[in-house]
């Protein structure tokens, strides 16, 4: 264009004569470009919902290990092998678990696009404009990640939770506003077709097989299809709650199965408390290998309330004796102590021995509290407060997460929480200190909390025939001929910190004070 060329030559000539001319020309050009960009952005924000594209992605499945046998958590190549004399013990193999063919996330594009359009429509009806929307498909839940337009309040979207659920005609919708670490808002929507998260796919993942956790618990998969694991040794105690039939028992079985696939009988002992008498009975076959019990107990699975109290008091005695050994050894925790033991740095004549981890699992904790009350609550609280360093960890489960069952004393000492679907928002607040568990869809859908924000996880599924095969395999392996014997429990007064009073060392004014403070006969009558 002749005119453009002429204008350009004039501009260059002017810049040659005046040094400021080029600077002023550049400033005008930048202002024009900025104004045009703002106009384009404003126009894009006003587009109708059908013009907003959406990326649909499925996170890749965890890489599977090639071996059929799960390796132990940490191989102890040391002078003393803590696995002796049962070094020929073989860990359970993965072919004992059922392998489901349909193990990947299923994408129904029509469903995703329909949900996207409904979400945009509902938000638009309330004056909420969005810039982008992205969907990540998980096993049972799809996460729609939304980037709202400038000036949109997060609380406004959060308040539309019920309207979005009504529009999508779905239960279990949850809004995360904002998603931690991102400048986006998440809307979790259940898939029309859910996929089973098998225990086999979890234990066969590289993440589980190569973990260095002391007590690895594989719970399931997240919305992003990632294997979700926690270390019970670091939690250090876990509170599990959920209404009947929502996956609580399956979750406990997944926890036990994870530990059985990773730990040697010399490294782990279980104390299983089952007031219902049916939940843990399948594990009685591995009592000699993996159980711990008071000496005169006939049944490896504890079901009687009086025996539960004795066992808990026995665990308190065990905890105190272990602390004495740690003090003698100059160790701060069980890991340091065991490392000194296997490196020949402790004298066996001083009573030192290898310490296995002890995991106490209590099902139907509510029944125990209703029948035994403080007799159960006090030793549990004491163990939860002090036992972490000596390798004693607790998992308690209940289907009634009320404040009378889960007291403030219990909650304060159980930082790890798992909530399956509960019946009310009040129950959700009791277990998680927030709502959300009442909005889950059931069938293993759960929230895990051990910090600020809960993580939504689809619990791994392991059924009774699989557990029976695992227990049969373990029982055929070389191992101890009887359960680990727990120390004799202290009598009731000593367990509660009381005991008989030695009157010889009392203050000389004690009897006078006692008479002064005691009620008069008239008051007693």
Question: Regions from the language model: what does each represent?
Answer:
Residues 328-337, 487:
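Short catalytic/ligand-gating loop segments at beta-alpha or beta-beta junctions
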Residues 315, 340-342:
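Conserved helicase/translocase P-loop NTPase motor core
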């Amino acid at each position: 264009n002749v005119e453009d060329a002429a204008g350009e030559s004039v501009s260059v000539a002017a810049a040659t004569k005046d040094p400021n001319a080029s600077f002023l020309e550049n400033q005008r050009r930048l202002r024009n470009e900025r104004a045009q960009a703002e106009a384009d952005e404003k126009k894009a924000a006003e587009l109708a919902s059908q013009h907003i594209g959406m990326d649909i992605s499925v996170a890749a499945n965890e890489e599977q290990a090639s071996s059929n046998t799960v390796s132990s958590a940490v191989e102890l190549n040391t002078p003393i092998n803590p696995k002796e004399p049962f070094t020929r013990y073989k860990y359970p193999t993965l072919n004992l678990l059922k392998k489901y063919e349909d193990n990947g996330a299923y994408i129904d594009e029509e469903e995703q696009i329909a949900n996207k359009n409904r979400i945009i429509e509902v938000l638009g009806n309330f004056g909420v404009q969005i810039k982008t929307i992205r969907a990540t498909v998980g096993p049972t839940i799809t996460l729609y990640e939304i980037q709202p337009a400038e000036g949109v309040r997060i609380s406004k979207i959060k308040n539309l939770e019920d309207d979005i659920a009504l529009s999508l005609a779905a239960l279990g919708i949850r809004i995360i506003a904002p998603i931690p670490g991102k400048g986006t808002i998440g809307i979790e929507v259940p898939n029309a077709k859910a996929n089973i998260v098998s225990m086999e796919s979890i234990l066969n993942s590289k993440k589980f097989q190569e973990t260095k956790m002391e007590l690895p618990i594989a719970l399931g998969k997240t919305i992003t299809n990632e294997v979700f694991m926690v270390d019970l040794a670091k939690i250090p105690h876990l509170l599990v709650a959920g209404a009947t039939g929502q996956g609580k028992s399956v979750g406990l079985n997944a926890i036990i199965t994870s530990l059985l696939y990773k730990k040697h009988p010399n490294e782990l002992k279980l104390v299983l408390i089952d007031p219902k008498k049916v939940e843990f009975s399948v594990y009685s076959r591995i009592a000699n290998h993996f159980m711990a019990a008071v000496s005169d107990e006939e049944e490896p699975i504890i079901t009687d309330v009086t025996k539960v109290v004795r066992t808990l008091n026995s665990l308190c005695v065990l905890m105190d004796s272990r602390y004495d050994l740690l003090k003698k050894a100059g160790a701060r925790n069980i890991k340091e102590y065991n490392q000194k033991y296997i490196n020949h740095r402790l004298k066996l004549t001083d009573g030192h021995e290898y310490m296995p981890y002890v995991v106490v699992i209590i099902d139907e904790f509510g029944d125990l509290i209703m029948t035994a009350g403080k007799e159960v609550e006090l030793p549990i609280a004491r163990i939860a407060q002090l036992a972490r360093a000596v390798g004693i960890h607790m998992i308690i489960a209940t289907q009634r997460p009320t404040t009378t069952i889960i007291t403030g004393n219990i909650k304060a000492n159980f930082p790890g929480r798992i909530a399956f679907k509960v019946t009310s928002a009040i129950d959700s607040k009791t277990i998680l200190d927030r709502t959300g568990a009442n909005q889950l869809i059931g069938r293993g859908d759960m929230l895990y909390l051990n910090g600020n924000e809960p993580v939504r996880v689809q619990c791994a599924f392991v059924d009774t025939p699989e557990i029976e095969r695992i227990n049969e395999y373990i029982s055929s392996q070389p191992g101890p001929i009887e359960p680990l014997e727990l120390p004799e429990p202290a009598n009731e007064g000593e367990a509660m910190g009381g005991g008989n009073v030695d009157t010889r060392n009392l203050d000389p004014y004690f009897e006078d004070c006692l008479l002064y403070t005691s009620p008069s006969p008239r008051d007693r009558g």
